Amino acid sequence: MQFKVSNVNKKRNLSAQIALVRNETPSDENYGLLDYSGHYTYSTRSTDSKQEQNLSPSLRLFGNFNIGKNQTLEFTAKGSYTQNDYTRQYTENENNSLSDVKEDLYSFNFSANYNIKLQHQNSFGIDIRHYHNITSSTYAGDYSSWQHLWTGESMFMLNYSQRFGKHFTMILRPGLSWMNYKLHTEDVRRYCSLKTSSRFSYQFNKKQQLALTADAGVNQPDISYMNNVDQTVDFLQIKRGNPFLDDMQLYNISLLYNGVFGKLNVVGGPGYSIYTHNVSPIYYLE
C-alpha cells in the first residue's frame, strides 16, 4: 500500500510518500529421509517447518530545487520500521527443536546532492549521504538471547563527468566512507576507507557501446551474521554468529559491451572482483 503527494513547478519538485508493506508465509514445510552411518547406523524421517511474517511502514521525503540556470540541489530523507517474526520447528522422530525470533529494525537514511553543469561538456557535483540502522532481536526456543546492533555509515563523494567529442565519456566519483557499528556488550568499531566509482565509455554509434568500470567500497555485516547466538540447524549442526566480524571491502573492475542488432540485444564482457573479510561459513567439531 502506498500514498504519495507531490508539488511541481519550474523551480522545485517536492514529494512525500507513505508506504506499508506486509509479507506473510503461513507455512513452509519440508520432509526428508535421513540415513546416518558411522558409530550409529540408522534411518529417520525429518520435518522442517517455517513460518514468517513481516510488517514495514516507511516515510520518504524528496526535494529537488533549481537554484540557477545550470545548478540543482536535491535532498532525500527516508525512515522506516520493520517488524520481523520468524518461527522454525525441526523434528526427527521424537526429537524436537524450536527457534523463535522477533526482530525490530529501525532504519534512517539521508542524502544531499549538489550538481552544476559547466561550459565544456562537463559537470561537477557533491554528494553527502548517511545511513543508520538499529536492530533488536529476541531469540527464544532452544537458545534464548537478546541482541542489539546499531550501524552507521557517512559518505562524502565528488562527482565529475566529462564528455570528449561525440563518442567518449568519463565519470569519476572519488570519496570517503566513515563506518561505525556496535553490538551490545562489545566495543564500538570504526573504519574510515576510500570509496570510488569510475566509468569510461566509448559509444561507437547509437546502438553500440563499450564501457570500463572500476569500483571500490565497503559493506557492513548485519545482525544475522554478527551476533552471540546459537541456533539449531539439525541435531548434528549448530549455527553460531561471530561478534568480531570486520567490515567487508569490495573491489571490482569490468569491461562491458552493449549492442543492439535489430530485435537482438547483446550484453557481455569480462569482470574481476576481490572481497576481503568476506563472510563465509566455517565448520568445526566440538
Task: List the predicted regions and their residue ranges.
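Primarily recognizes Gram-negative and organellar outer-membrane beta-barrels
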Residues: 1-286
